[in-house]
Amino acid sequence: TKVDLTVEKGSDAKTLVLNIKYTRPGDTLAEVELRQHGSEEWEPMTKKGNLWEVKSAKPLTGPMNFRFLSKGGMKNVFDEVIPTAFTVGKTYTPEYN
C-alpha cells in the first residue's frame, strides 16, 4: 500500500483539504480521520469529490496524524505526517513503521 497526501487549495490555519492517493489494488478509502498533535481525539474528515476536508474552530496543530479505513477493511495509522506550517501544493508521504 502506498499513500501520498497532497495539501490542496482551500487549506489554511483552520482548514485542511487533502487529495489522498491510496494505492492498494482492488481497494479504496472508506474513512479518513485526523488527530492533531497533543490531542487524544480522532476527527473525521469529510469526503468532497476526490478531496478530504476537515475544518477546526481553532488553528490546526501539527504534526498531524491520520487514520485510514479502507472499504476492504484495512486499517492504517500514520503518525506525524503533516506539519503545522504545511505548504499548499506539497505532497507528504508517510513513513511506514
Swiss-Prot record:
Signal peptide coordinates: none
Domain spans labelled Expansin-like CBD: 14-94
Keywords: Allergen, Secreted
UniProt-listed GO biological process terms: plant-type cell wall loosening
Domain of life: Eukaryota
Similarity comment: Belongs to the expansin family. Expansin B subfamily.
Name the UniProt record assigns to this protein: Pollen allergen Lol p 3
Species: Lolium perenne (Perennial ryegrass)
